[in-house]
A protein has these predicted regions:
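Amphipathic alpha-helical dimerization/coiled-coil segments
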Residues: 86-113
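A cross-family signal for key residues in well-ordered alpha-helices
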Residues: 18, 32, 51, 89, ...
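Beta-hairpin "wing" of winged helix-turn-helix
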Residues: 57-74, 79
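Basic amphipathic alpha-helical segments that dock to polyanions
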Residues: 49-56
């Protein structure tokens, strides 16, 4: 099951930052990397990705530059800035605290009769 339509607000930005933290990537490479690091559980649509990339560049969290892709096509590559690295660290810590709190709140579920 893919969770593409069930991402919480802000989660896409975090996933993009995480994907790019592993090295500069073009848009399609970011889509593939998110799929890879999530075990293909998270599949992001291009229509959602590119507005997120533009937003992160405007915020100074990503830097974009033109380069050549593996198939010799011109592509825009994205990489983390120092501010992006800091935001990724902060948001990852926040996400981990939230996931722990939700896990504790849900606790063990009683078996259905």
């Amino acid at each position: 099951m893919t969770l593409q339509a069930q991402l919480l607000p802000g989660t896409l930005d975090l996933l993009i930052l995480r994907a790019v933290s592993l090295g500069p990537l073009h848009g399609y490479g970011i889509l593939l990397r998110i799929g890879q690091i999530s075990g293909n559980a998270l599949l992001i649509e291009q229509g959602a990705l590119y507005p997120g990339l533009f937003r992160l560049v405007r915020q100074g969290l990503l830097k974009a530059s033109w380069g050549t892709s593996d198939n010799n096509r011109r592509a825009k590559f994205y990489e983390l800035t120092a501010a992006g690295r800091k935001r990724l660290r902060e948001e990852t810590e926040s996400w981990n605290r939230l996931a722990t709190a939700i896990g504790a709140a849900l606790g063990e579920q009683p078996e259905e009769a």
